[in-house]
Design a protein with these regions (language model features):
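Short glycine/threonine/proline-enriched tight-turn/helix- or strand-capping micro-motif at secondary-structure
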Residues: 15-26, 55
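Mid-domain Rossmann-like dinucleotide-binding core that forms the NAD(H)/NADP(H) cofactor-binding site
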Residues: 122-192
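Glycine-rich beta-strand-centered segment in the early N-terminal region that forms part
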Residues: 26-44, 52-96
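Short N-terminal binding/cap micro-motifs at the start of the first secondary-structure element
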Residues: 11-18, 46-47
Length: 192
């Protein structure tokens, strides 16, 4: 049995329980090039809210009546993708469900899964951490001694950018956050 949350209505403002529907049924069998992943962890990233909008934000919008899209982590339990055999621990784009069926290209194998806490692959070692690293070092070209300004300093990506900048030898790291509570968090928790 697969339990999953479907998006049935586009949220207006903060999502409400009535925007979702709970469904139980069999997991969809994988098609050619697809895998079924038993979802162990779901990243509850703020980006999901944008994917619920008709514009999809920077991503294809979640179709109404479909499972809510999210970054998930778990083992492959069925595979029609030779790159991801059954038993491979993966992280990628799945859904709010017990089992996510999706193209194998949506997932990457988790390397050295036995050497790290698995949830780390959803944040610092996963898409959020890769985004922070790519933005800071590949796009911005940060070098030792640079001063770094981080917008969205208390968010998932921003908080990691700040830590990477400090560890990378930035001379100064300054964070921008929305409001006194987030600014206090930036200083007291993230050490700006």
């Amino acid at each position: 049995t697969n339990r999953e949350w479907l998006l049935v209505k586009r949220p207006q403002g903060l999502p409400q329980r009535s925007d979702y529907e709970w469904r139980e049924g069999p997991a969809r069998a994988p098609g050619e090039g697809e895998v079924v992943v038993r979802v162990l962890y779901i990243a509850m990233d703020p980006a999901i809210r944008g994917w619920m909008d008709p514009s999809g934000n920077y991503f294809t919008p979640i179709p109404l009546g479909s499972p809510v899209t999210a970054v998930v982590l778990g083992p492959v339990v069925e595979s029609r993708d030779p790159r991801l055999p059954v038993g491979t621990m993966v992280c990628g784009l799945g859904s709010w469900s017990d089992y996510a069926t999706a193209p194998g290209l949506f997932f990457n194998p988790v390397v050295d899964a036995d050497q790290h806490d698995l949830v780390a692959f959803l944040h610092p070692l996963g898409p959020v951490g890769l985004t922070a690293h790519y933005g800071l070092f590949d796009r911005a070209g940060m070098k030792k001694g640079d001063a770094v300004l981080v917008s969205g300093a208390t968010g998932g990506v921003g908080s990691l950018v700040a830590q990477m900048a400090r560890l990378g030898g930035a001379s100064k790291v300054v964070g921008i956050a929305g409001g006194p509570v987030k600014c206090r968090q930036a200083v007291e928790v993230f050490g700006y």
